[in-house]
Amino acid sequence: MSEFSQTVPELVAWARKNDFSISLPVDRLSFLLAIATLNGERLEGEMSEGELVDAFRHVSDAFEQTSETISQRANNAINDLVRQRLLNRFTSEITEGNAIYRLTPLGIGITDYYIRQREFSTLRLSMQLSIVAGELKRAADAAEEGGDEFHWHRNVFAPLKYSVAEIFDSIDLTQRIMDEQQQLVKDDIAQLLNKDWRAAISSCELLLSETSGTLRELQDTLDAAGDKLQANLLRIQDSTMARDDLHFVDRLVFDLQSKLDRIVSWGQQAIDLWIGYDRHVHKFIRTAIDMDKNRVFAQRLRQSVQTYFDEPWALTYANADRLLDMRDEEMALRDEEVTGELPADLEFEEFNEIREQLAALIEAQLAVYKEKGIPLDLGLVAREFLAQYPRGRHFDVARIVVDQAVQLGVAQADFTGLPAKWQPINDYGAKVQAHVIDKY
């Protein structure tokens, strides 16, 4: 961000002396946004008091407020914005009783945040980077030419300070707005999944893909221009090494290099974090689908009942006679006495026993990884485990293997965004797609 020439105590004393304060409830903020929108349609960039009252009337109607006291409330709102230095009021003897109003830099900054800065544009970013590249190239050429202190201030320091640094701050602000938009998208996805996740799958996919595409476009644009920008900054830095009186230029170049590194680094980190969130949402949807298989019949039955009068149907059901237990309640029977000894092919193995065996196998694989540094290959583990069970149990066993392995750790290759190779896990065509888990 921009540097501050004042210290913290000086800034605090300055704010206290001038009695700075901002209070913008939703109706006041809406009024300010309405003023900014209407002001943008005017070439002169100024508005009369009557136009402000008309804008306030639109806001009052939207909030369903009474229209009887609209003039008084509009006057109070205008005075409040003037007091908070969001509007400037200009009066003269010629236009007495009909003042002219203009938005202050603070008012423009607030409205820009809510209106214009939220519109991400790759073309806008490309133009900003193109302007920065041109300014840096001219500054680097001027630095290599050399000259007196006035030459360095006018042709090197000034473009870097008042053009390049401000555009870097604008790009940094765009990234921070993108961070906030990601949180809003996450909230939207959470609300969709909580209401009706089946109907929300397509909407979630759209939100995920749009955000991923926007982040990728932003990062690709930064990567394409980042190397050239750093090269020109290095040219300026090399030119200042032989001069002891250019420490102010050297410090500014160092700050710009840090800003550029932070922008590019955070862009890539934001993509990696979003990829992890994308995988988390898809895993949740897959788990919900697996758990909801038994509800398919119930959902179809409800739909059939709702459309009965349009598409009548007949229901056939069987009601068998109840079996009465004629045994003595106090007589305790053993399984061996009732069923006899079961053949080996008919032995029953509980689900919990399978999970315990799986946990033991995964634990053994993990021990090998820790001792010898061998990554955990999910395809190999699943194949070895499925070989111990008949074909009819392969699906359930494979799902348990995957769930347990995912709980152990992650694969660093997942963050690259590249798909893993399909690996066969049995002799009947079943395959698994997963990177090698190498981070626990």
From Swiss-Prot:
Keywords: Calcium, Cell cycle, Cell division, Chromosome partition, Cytoplasm, DNA condensation
Region annotated Leucine-zipper, chain positions: 208-236
GO MF terms held by the record: calcium ion binding
Cited InterPro entries: Chromosome_partition_MukF, MukF_C, MukF_C_sf, MukF_M, MukF_M_sp, MukF_WHTH, WH-like_DNA-bd_sf, WH_DNA-bd_sf
GO CC terms: cytoplasm; nucleoid
UniProt keyword Cell division, yes or no: yes
A Gene Ontology biological process term: chromosome segregation
Localization: Cytoplasm, Nucleoid
Similarity section: Belongs to the MukF family.
Biological role: Involved in chromosome condensation, segregation and cell cycle progression. May participate in facilitating chromosome segregation by condensation DNA from both sides of a centrally located replisome during cell division. Not required for mini-F plasmid partitioning. Probably acts via its interaction with MukB and MukE. Overexpression results in anucleate cells. It has a calcium binding activity.
Subunit and partners: Interacts, and probably forms a ternary complex, with MukE and MukB via its C-terminal region. The complex formation is stimulated by calcium or magnesium. It is required for an interaction between MukE and MukB.
Protein name: Chromosome partition protein MukF
Record organism: Klebsiella pneumoniae subsp. pneumoniae (strain ATCC 700721 / MGH 78578)
